[in-house]
Amino acid sequence: MKTRVLLTVVAGILLASPAFAQSDACDRACLESTVDRFLDAFVKHDPSMAPLTRTVRFTENGQRLTVGDGSWRSMIAKGTYRLFVTDPRAGQVAFIGTLREENQQNKDGAPVLIALRLRVERRQISEIELFVVRNENAAKNCEKLGTPHPLFLEAVPPAERMSRADLVKTANMYFTGMQQNDGKGVYPFTDDCNRFENGGQSTNVPPKPGETRADPKTATMYSSQWGCTEQFASGLLHFVSRIRDRRYVAVDE
């Protein structure tokens, strides 16, 4: 059975309040459309266009800001890469995608990569957590991917679904396996696993012409030519000394 776990920047799992009326519930379509409504308001520099609570909390790159400040002033258009992690049970949705930011050298704006979390209560946004990565190559690489891998968009048959707790546990094993990597951990990868970092493939990269594939048993540095398990089992990711503040804000069941 394949485990399909999406690793994003994402906060402790919050259960939706049973006190909410059924009419106030926000399903998958509702949550994802709320992201679009937020982004439309964001690139128009107009918070009044978004369904915000009066006490909405907004952070950007870890800093508490007033709604309308920060990147609200500089983003000018939505990009083309879109990946949702939607959790109706928690009333939260995470989004990884691209935007365009005003740029004097480019009238169409410079591409940026964002990670976004919204908490939605009674169909209004009560929390906005935004990370902006101003790395044009990363944003361009994501857009070159076109759409997310089909497995991320495929509904897992009910009989094959993991529990919320096991999904989080498996995702956390990725970070635990990378932190102070020694090659002796448990690495739950499928044989055809691939890793992508900032939109670029970092596993199973074919050797260049005339180049010999590095041997994970004898190499002294890890290689992007190896598969996921080979990289982790090599013990050569030990330069990642700590992965802290691990948070799982959305579990897409």
Where are these regions (language model features)?
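Bacterial N-terminal signal peptides
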Residues: T8-S17
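C-terminal and inter-domain tail/linker signature
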Residues: A21-E253
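Bacterial N-terminal signal peptides that target proteins for export
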Residues: M1-L7
